[in-house]
Amino acid sequence: MTHTLILLRHGESEWNAKNLFTGWVDVNLTEKGRAEAVRGGELMREAGVLPDVVHTSVQRRAINTACLALDAADRHWIPVRRSWRLNERHYGALQGKNKKETLEAYGEEQFMLWRRSFDVPPPPIEEDSEFSQFGLPQYAGLGDDMPHTECLKDVIARFLPYWESDIVPDLRAGHTVLIAAHGNSLRALVKHLDGISDEDIAGLNIPTGMPLVYELDDDFRPTVPHGRYLDPEAAAAAAAAVANQGR
């Protein structure tokens, strides 16, 4: 028996368009991003790959992407479950900063360490920063789990317990699962699924609004490594654009 998993990064956000580090800042989709989300749902419908349940973050750009995609796929009625564990990586003190200006200020090596390394987090955010999430009601119960900054290793550490406790049981029950989330939370899961090394994960870029489908065996490992995009040519072009952010 195989289990179908669909990964969908949110459509272009307002801060994607401005080339800003976003992280946990709760920005909305652009009109382009809304169109990308709708197209993602259309691709699922056209391919006949239709989810029965959705898992998403508590950030509006992912939640709204899920809603728009589901409506386009005529699956607006299925359950949607939200968890902070699917949030984007927290970019610490980089949140709100322009990527190009950060690259120019700190140089290529430091920029790429902060942006794409496995275990080097950016400097921590101050709790009273305008780009901090401390004190927001959606995070009231986190306590010591509330991050000041994260690297990809940290995202994996918070994501995988939810994967095992909530998503795997849905897959095991025979549901087709859609995860509508973020570039780095999805990179964290793909690293786990495909066994990508700590070094090679730096080269993985996930484009906005492009459904990526995995068929998993009974051990929840891919039957075909790296899955398949429902629109592979468009996904490849969009992933290249993600790689060039900051330039």
From Swiss-Prot:
Q: What is its EC number?
A: 5.4.2.11
GO molecular function ontology, one term from the record = phosphoglycerate mutase activity
Instruction: Report keywords, A-Z.
Output: Gluconeogenesis, Glycolysis, Isomerase
Q: Which of this chain's residues are annotated to bind substrate?
A: 9-16, 22-23, 61, 88-91, 99, 115-116, 183-184
Q: Which residues form the active site?
A: H10, E88
Annotated positions for site Transition state stabilizer: H182
> Which residues form each disulfide bond in the chain?
none
Q: One GO BP annotation here?
A: glycolytic process
Reaction(s) catalysed (UniProt annotation): (2R)-2-phosphoglycerate = (2R)-3-phosphoglycerate
Pathway(s) annotated for this protein in UniProt = Carbohydrate degradation; glycolysis; pyruvate from D-glyceraldehyde 3-phosphate: step 3/5
Specify whether Isomerase is a keyword of the entry.
Answer: yes
Name the PANTHER family for this protein. Answer: PHOSPHOGLYCERATE MUTASE
Q: Which family does it belong to?
A: Belongs to the phosphoglycerate mutase family. BPG-dependent PGAM subfamily.
Q: What does this protein do?
A: Catalyzes the interconversion of 2-phosphoglycerate and 3-phosphoglycerate.
Q: What is the protein name stated in its UniProt record?
A: 2,3-bisphosphoglycerate-dependent phosphoglycerate mutase
Species name: Nocardioides sp. (strain ATCC BAA-499 / JS614)
